[in-house]
Every structure is written in structure tokens, then in C-alpha cells.
Amino acid sequence: MLDRLQIIKQKFDEISDLIIQPDVIADQKRYVALNQEYKGLKSLVEKRDEYVILMANIEEANEIIADGSDADMVEMAKMQLEEAKERLPELEEEIKFLLIPKDAEDAKNVMVEIRAGTGGDEASIFAGDLFRMYTKYCENRGWRTSVVDMNEGTSGGFKEVIFEVTGEDVYGTLKFEAGVHRVQRVPQTETQGRVHTSAATVMVLPEAEEFDVQIDMNDVRVDFFCSSGPGGQSVNTTKSAVRLTHIPTGLVAQCQDQKSQHKNKDKAFGVLRSRLYEQELAKKQADDAVKRTSQVSSGDRSAKIRTYNYSQGRVTDHRIGLDVFDMDGVMNGKIQKFVDELQLVNNMEKLKESEIF
């Protein structure tokens, strides 16, 4: 293990030197990529340094005990050895998890799409609840959110809402939220007090850079239209909203959130690029799924992943059998418990595959 950690330390030292070079700082794309790699290796190198010191302490303590000439030193060495041996398995476990290979997309920003499914107006209201849940979670994480496009429901919420999330390790954190979310509750419009079941689909797309996906402009039809608000009323009289249609795939992306046609077009291209990138990832994930059965796959958008049962105050994640009895907290963005448990299961699966130890 130490040999592998030494290679990582050398790589870390190289990056540390590179990120202070003027030519690297001037190249923002390269600087950002190297800085992310630096942050990813920093904690591992710190653990490596602790491991080296710990192994040296164990060796020193064993030598003192073997010598046995100084009784006081032997007692101190025994205490040092006991402490080191107690810490060693914990440290090895921490290093083991840090050595698990991360997905290349984990550091990327994301586009989140929430669409109302079965359940009519109640499904739109639930989609709005999920939107608020995620934006509050993002706010607590210090991430920025920006609405790209929305289609509001007739009784509140959204038939569809697309928003961008920017920050650190966004995709790696949110990717397991993709899938079908189901709600069981009495709708506000229900007069008989009957519980209804509705659903909304969440998609989490890693934001693609221009070098990730090449789009031939000849393959894209661009339409301009007047942006509209709730109920379809016109927000402005200029055709500032933009709709893009990728002819080879039939994928459509639009944006009407910005006042400027140019900004709407840029954002719409961002959505289109991410959708095309997600298609490529979905194919890769499908190939990976043939090789292994993952409990927490982030690729199947049709899988029912979570149920929000209001009458019982219970939120259940069906992939890992986790129940959380804090409906108010969850709907106000307290979903870290789900994030942590899903990442843990995913890491355990990767650990079995990677054969690090």
C-alpha cells in the first residue's frame, strides 16, 4: 500500500508545483482541472503522511521493547505501540475509501430536471415541493442554483422545471437523486380525505463542457418565441425565448428565464449539451450494468427510488431500505442522510470491484 501512496504523493507534489506556475494560472480551464485534482489528492496525502509516521512509531516502539535495557522507556514504548495499533486499522480503512476511484463526472456542475408524472395537479404540486427541497439543500451546501426553464402547474408547482446547480462535487452528491419519486398524501383539493398517490421524475445531468460534446450547428434547429408565464400569459412582447431541436436525436432544449435572447440561447445550448452527454453516459452505465448489478445505480430514470408517505411522516429510499421519520425536515432540504448512505453503499460496491487491498 505504501508504494501506491508514494506514487500519489509524487503526483500531488507535481500538481502543487504546477498550480503556482504563471502559464497554468493564465489557462483557466487547465488551472481549474488541476486545482480540483489537487483538492482530491490533498486529504489522501495527509492520511499517507499520518500512516508513515504511525508505521515509524510502531517500528521504533518494537525496537525499544526488544532492547529492554530501560524499563521506563519500555513502558512508554508499550503505550505508544498500543495506541498506534489501535489507530492503524482505522487509518487503513480511511485510506481504503479515499483510494476508491472517483467517477470523472463527480466534480461537474449539474442540470436538474423535475417533471410531474402521474397524479394530475397533485403531481405538479409535488414537483414544486421537490424543487424547493433541492434548492434548500443546495443553499445549505453553499451551492448556487439558477432556473433555466419552467412550466408552472395550473394549481401550483410545476409540470416541469429545469435548474442549474454550481458548486463543488455537485454531480457526485446529487446523482443518486435521479429516478421516480412517489408521494402518498391527501391533496389540498381532496374533499373526501382520501390518500392519493402521485409521482415526479427527477433527472440529474452532469453539465457538459464544449469539449465533452461536439454539436454540429447544421444539426440544430433554432426557434425564437415570446416567453410566457403561468396560464400562458405573455411575459414580454419580444421573442427572447429560445427553443433548440437537435435533429439527429430529436432532443429539445429551451430557455425563457433570461430577458436577453443571447443569454437564453447560451443556456439552452447548455441544457442540450448536457442531455446529449447524459445519453452517452447512460449507454456506458447500461454496459456497466451488464457487468454488475448495482444497488444504487444513477442511470435508470424509470426506477422508483423513494416514497414520501405523509400520513406516516416517513420517507423511504427503496434502494437501500432506509426509512427517515422527519417529513418536514426532508422537505426543507435535510436529505444528507440519504446522500451519505447511498454514497457509502456505492463506495462499498466499488471497493469490492477495485480490489484495493
From Swiss-Prot:
| Gene3D superfamilies, per database record | 3.30.160.20, 3.30.70.1660, 6.10.140.1950
Modification type N5-methylglutamine: residues: 233
Q: Where is the signal peptide?
A: none
Give the record's keywords alphabetically.
Cytoplasm, Methylation, Protein biosynthesis
| Annotated compartments | Cytoplasm
A GO molecular function annotation here is: translation release factor activity, codon specific
Processing and modification events after translation = Methylated by PrmC. Methylation increases the termination efficiency of RF1.
Q: Does the keyword tRNA-binding apply?
A: no
Coiled-coil residues are none
Q: What is its main location?
A: cytoplasm
User: Domain of life, per the record?
Assistant: Bacteria
Q: Which InterPro entries match?
A: PCRF, Pep_chain_release_fac_I, Pep_chain_release_fac_I_sf, Prokaryotic/Mito_RF, RF-1
One GO cellular component this record assigns the protein to is: cytoplasm
User: Hey, which family's this protein in?
Assistant: Belongs to the prokaryotic/mitochondrial release factor family.
**Function text:** Peptide chain release factor 1 directs the termination of translation in response to the peptide chain termination codons UAG and UAA.
Q: Which NCBIfam families match?
A: prfA (TIGR00019), PRK00591.1 (NF001859)
This chain's protein is named Peptide chain release factor 1
Originating species = Flavobacterium psychrophilum (strain ATCC 49511 / DSM 21280 / CIP 103535 / JIP02/86)
